[in-house]
């Protein structure tokens, strides 16, 4: 029986708008897709295609300037309709108008003896995430271990069976492939009710609140990252794609997406293709009266993309919540309303049943202020790290302190709950991302 790990620190946000107990709606039709280079942290994109060029699903559209063998590929076949650039000509998006009939790149099975080359050529390498730094790993790197979290514990997240999309055999084949990339162990984090075991991995059962499903929490609980260590994390959906590649010779870029949130008329599960436009996913299913904020991802770590945006990595959830439910609320936080949610028992709602769900909006109820050293991060931060002191060291750009306090173990998503409960209203995930980028620049 796999070892049980109990995560005691954390917080489950019980939000209205969960999509549960449904088979995915058949593929959502759309011709508007985009690839967002910011989804592949650590890469400096160099375009391989220009506007008007035709691409096939699985064909490379850009590569990394520093490691040209790392390719990012198109999820659909079609015409490159637009290349969106921002400040200093930074590539913000590469838009593709999909063909009516899709064609996939086929890969030569004889090349699969070189696993690394196959993953690089197929574009799946870009979906690995390395710790330290939370970036796409270098092809020269060899991980100490590889971690797979098979469940998502974030608010309104889709279930385990939807993440793997009922492709357990492809998942197990993907794990077998991953086991050949490391001299260490492939660790799989599971919930007790959805245990997965293979001959090429070691499974752990995790219980407890969010962030139990985060790879960082599982790494810290199973085998923490020390200075000099390199470990990789990968999403379960990508493991299925790897298994599909090594079984059938092509990559299936479809995904299952949970459409969730209070501002959605009917929370549902749909089948789509990675990078699809948000307007197609949400067609006639948003309550405009609630002035919705459309988030690609979950409400803690997702990106505010708006109605004209696109589905972003990890391509599994869209959350739509009201911008502000009540802009002129009498007494505000001092109202002590039992209907209001509080992580610190400010309101009497903490006496309500654990099954009760709450209304959440995008209002932050205050502005940025000095850090209050009250140990509030520690209540929801399950790692053996002094989170508040680490944040202060990052802000000060004190590399020695950052290393001593465990920056090599963390990535921005590990601080999402801390950001949610933060009295100081700091953008902690942005601070951590900038700190990791600074550290990487100084140490390499």
Region annotations inferred by a language model:
Residues 1-13, 24, 81, 86-103:
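Mobile cofactor-carrier "swinging-arm" domains
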Residues 1-48, 63, 203-206:
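N-terminal, Lys/Arg-enriched amphipathic/low-complexity engagement segments
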Residues 39-45, 55-58, 67-82:
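Generic structural motif
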Residues 36-40, 50-52, 64-66, 83, ...:
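Acidic/polar N-terminal loop/beta-strand segments that form early-domain functional surfaces
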Residues 29, 41, 66, 264-266, ...:
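Residues that act as N-cap/strand-start positions at coil-to-secondary-structure junctions
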Residues 70, 84-444:
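Buried, small/hydrophobic-residue-enriched core segments of structured protein domains
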